[in-house]
Structure formats: C-alpha cells, structure tokens
Amino acid sequence: MEWSRFDNYVVTDDKARIDFDRVFDWLSDAYWALGRSRDVMARSIENSVALSCLSPGGVQVGFSRWVSDGATFGWLCDVIVDPALRGRGLGTFMVESAVHHPFVAEVPLRLLATRDAHSLYEQFGFTVVPNPLRWMEFRQSSHQ
C-alpha cells in the first residue's frame, strides 16, 4: 500500500524500502526506544506492519509501525521523522496514512503512547485513555 502527498513524499508499507540503518539511528536516540538492539529492532519490524515515509528521491525520512492482530487491537508505535525535516507536516502525513492502513482500518481499538505529541494524534481521533489505572504492563527484566 502506498500514499502520496502533494509534494511527492510517499508513505509505503513495502518493507524492502526501509533504510534500516537510518531508522535504527533515529530510534536509538528516541526516549521510548533507548537501548533497543539492532536484532530486537529487526524482529520488531519483521513482525509488524512497518510504514516508511520517503522523500521524492526515495530517501527514508520517517518511520512508524503497527502491532496488531488485525481484528480487535492495534498499537501504533515508533513514529519518528528525520530530525532535520521536522515541522514540515511529515509526521501528520505518516499518522494519517497509518490510521487508514487497511490492516487496521476496521480495528475498533487502536492505541499509542506519547510523552509530547498529543496534539498530533488528537487530529486523528486519538484521546487520552480515560482509566489509565486499568492498564498494566509486564517487563521481562522485572520478572525473571
């Protein structure tokens, strides 16, 4: 699946077009992915619907991915734009493309986590979870 923007940027789910080194470098500096190894990153991409935002020349300028069963639940994560290109609407284009991806288009519950981009996601219907204390997490390192 591929979406195009007025200035010829595209978002694609073609994993063959991912510039893994660029994505890994960006995510290595992202607060939510610190310490994630190359192997873990590769497996996470392999086992999700990965979306790449590409410049008109085909250079990777953004990335995101869906983790979902395709029926009941979806988790949008690792949404990131090349730091040199932020503020140009590419994040908005990526999220718009992601929420319309056919793999999750009919999924009733789609979640994400953000520390600082609430206004971006609110444009597409995401809201703050009303009862966050109902959510729990399991971290492998804390249960060995």
Regions found by a protein language model. Name each.
Residues I18, A71, D116-S119:
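Short alpha-helical
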